[in-house]
């Protein structure tokens, strides 16, 4: 599962939303707001750590435009990807393969801060692979993602994602 897919899973668990949840979280911010997330995948041979910084470039009633820079470490090797722009439509994606499995509220500590979060549990099947996840979202963080955990039939250990820094303008 890629970082983009993971973030999409985090934001698409409502049944069915009238507004794209990813758009809603970014629409509450001003241009220049950003979030840095760290994703860790443990494999049999090595840990893979990805750090992504997503910055809001523009927000309109129809869309939010973000740019993400990503650096991935495979053992002692590091790969930096070129910045990627993404338009997040205000309209939800009707083809989203997500099935909500539970919803609650919880207070957690992220980057040393206590945050009240909405917790979503979900299941999905994509390309014949079943996955489960749990995501903590909050309007305090640009983009909304505080923390997520994913498991899959083909992953030897859970994939974990957590916001480590952010600035909301």
Region spans (language model):
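Acidic, serine/threonine-rich low-complexity disordered tracts
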Residues: 15-169
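Sec-dependent N-terminal signal peptides
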Residues: 1-13
């Amino acid at each position: 599962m890629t970082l983009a897919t993971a973030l999409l899973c985090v934001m698409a668990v409502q049944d069915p939303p009238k507004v794209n949840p990813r758009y809603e979280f970014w629409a509450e911010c001003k241009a220049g707001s950003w979030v840095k997330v760290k994703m860790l995948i443990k494999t049999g041979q090595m840990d893979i750590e990805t750090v992504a910084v997503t910055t809001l470039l523009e927000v309109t009633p129809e869309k939010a435009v973000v740019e993400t820079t990503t650096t991935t470490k495979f053992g002692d090797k590091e790969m930096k990807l070129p910045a990627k722009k993404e338009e997040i439509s205000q309209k939800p994606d009707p083809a989203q393969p997500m099935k909500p499995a539970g919803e609650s509220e919880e207070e957690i500590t992220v980057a040393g801060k206590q945050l009240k979060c909405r917790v979503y549990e979900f299941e999905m099947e994509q390309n014949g692979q079943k996955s489960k996840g749990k995501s903590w979202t909050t309007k305090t963080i640009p983009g909304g993602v505080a923390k997520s955990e994913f498991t899959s039939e083909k992953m030897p250990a859970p994939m974990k994602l957590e916001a480590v820094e952010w600035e909301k303008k």
